[in-house]
Amino acid sequence: MTNHFINHIPSYTLRHAWYHHVLGWRVGSGAAILLGQHVQMAGVRSSGHKVSIGCDTVINQGCMLYTTGGLIIGEHVSISSGVWLVTGSHEMNHPAFVDFYKPIVIGNYVWIGMRATILGGITIGEGAVVMAGAVVTHDVAPCTVVGGVPARVITQRELTNPSYTLDFHPLFE
């Protein structure tokens, strides 16, 4: 019910109050979570794992935040439309096909391109770039650009002492 209710509130302030007081999330100042109709938040509070979204981070519409395993997103992170952050999976060799959960940690100044998928247990280092459509199955080192399925190193980003601020707040978001 939370997904359907909160996705349609056209007020940044009310949504952020909901995240903090009802879901127990920590959302930094200036963070923009553009929910719309297509973002889903699963496992929001019952697991006891924390969700933290840093200052000036932008999460665009159409993203899937599967938070049961825990989700830590740094500051000044740009998450493009359609990105999936999936902290859970299944033990495929277990007779009962049991599920398991691992946290996702995303460092500061990371850019995740459209429709990329980040799996549980992954850490993405500061300043890294995940190209559109990539499926990240291993940790990504700082300032590394990865792409493909599964994601592989494409190049290194020449970024020293990043200081930019993401500032994206549409009128009715």
Task: Provide a role label for each language-model segment.
Residues 9, 22, 48, 68, ...:
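Residues at secondary-structure transition points
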Residues 19-24, 45-47, 75-81, 95:
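Short, functional N-terminal and low-complexity linear motifs
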Residues 29, 34-35, 40-41, 49, ...:
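Left-handed beta-helix
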Residues 40-44, 91-97:
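A short, acidic/glycine-rich surface segment
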Residues 84-85, 91, 152, 160:
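Active-site/binding-pocket entry motifs
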